Amino acid sequence: MGAPILYCAGPAPIMNCGMQNRSGSEDVASKKMADAGLPVIARFEVRHRNYLAPDGSINRPLPAFASDASLLTALYRAMVLLRIFDRKAVALQRTGRLGTYAVSLGQEAVSVGIASAMRGEDVLLPSYRDNGALIWRGVKLEEILLFWGGDERGNHFSGPVEDFPFCVPVGSQAPHAAGVAYAFKLRREPRVAVCMFGDGATSKGDVYEAMNFAGVHRLPVVFVVTNNQWAISVPLRLQTGCETLAQKAIAAGFIGEQVDGSDVVAVRAAAEDAIVAARDGQGPRFVEAVTYRLGDHTTSDDASRYRSADEVQTRWKEEPIARLRNYLVGQKMWSKAEEEALAAECHARVEAAVERYLATEQRRPETMFDHLYARLPEAYAAQRRELAGEGDV
């Protein structure tokens, strides 16, 4: 029997990924099987979705929701807020008032676009760079700052209470997402789990195990990979031999789609379709949002050591906020006065959140033991007592 032929669709015409490698040369083994007349038993496609060009022009007819000016401006406002929040968080870290921080610069469209397609009763399982999704879903800015300031109370945000906290070990939230979705299915609840992670997480076994389980049981879960081209300092070409990350869903038995992750309209549309399908009992979905990390991996990283300034400068031309602003201005949905008012509003909101964060009474060091076990083992209990200054141990 012949090997399945995988067809992938990107911005260019559909290419035969089963017969060619990245250089475009033909795979000798596949050609040999084809020449021998071995039958093709399956074909698969991964399609690429994009609506807005970097200059704000339209590549193809927009989805229905794009006629709602209030929604588009809400998406824009959320991305601007996230960027201003990021800048302030970095400033806090540089002045010793915040711990290591992961910026979202260049990736704002992914977390905001995905979250905007979710219902309130759905459950988000975010990665550490998905502040935009948390903010859209109602998490307070000061709660996010508490987390990055090393305070576990930041992981117990006031709402949505069933959303999961940030997951720092990459990919480890994927099995949790499958479990949440399994619970939804067993309870016959029309809810969806949305699991977000980066391209580096697709190299972890947790992700494949979760996807396989979800595929077998047709679970209402959407896996979203933010492909920002870099897993810290490791480029995508050293992470996978695949033409796309979306095609990894095929092995698990469900649909994967690639989307322009710098086009918030495309991200929202892909997320909406995937979530609706999962909610309607069509099984899991996988969305690969192709974007670019314009900033360092975190505030403890120096990306200039492993990528060129020219590469970053080129990618700045594709960034999501200017792209949507160009469209809104061109459609007379946004003005200079509104832009100035939004900037002032976002700065005021962020500064107020920072004041509340800095005014929060700091937790004592021994409280680090309070979020590990239901019953603390004696060895850890002794350490806790020592930190608390409760006498000899």
Model-derived features with residue positions:
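A short structural micro-motif
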Residues: 82, 120, 345-352, 374-378
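Glycine-rich ThDP/TPP pyrophosphate-binding loop and its adjacent helix/strand module
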Residues: 166, 171-359
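C-terminal intrinsically disordered, low-complexity extensions immediately downstream
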Residues: 359, 363-393
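Short, positively charged and aromatic/hydrophobic N-terminal segments
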Residues: 5-7, 13-16
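Cofactor-binding active-site loop characterized by glycine-rich and histidine/acidic residues
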Residues: 84-87, 91-217, 235-241, 246, ...
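N-terminal amphipathic, basic-rich helices that act as targeting or association modules
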Residues: 20-124, 128, 393
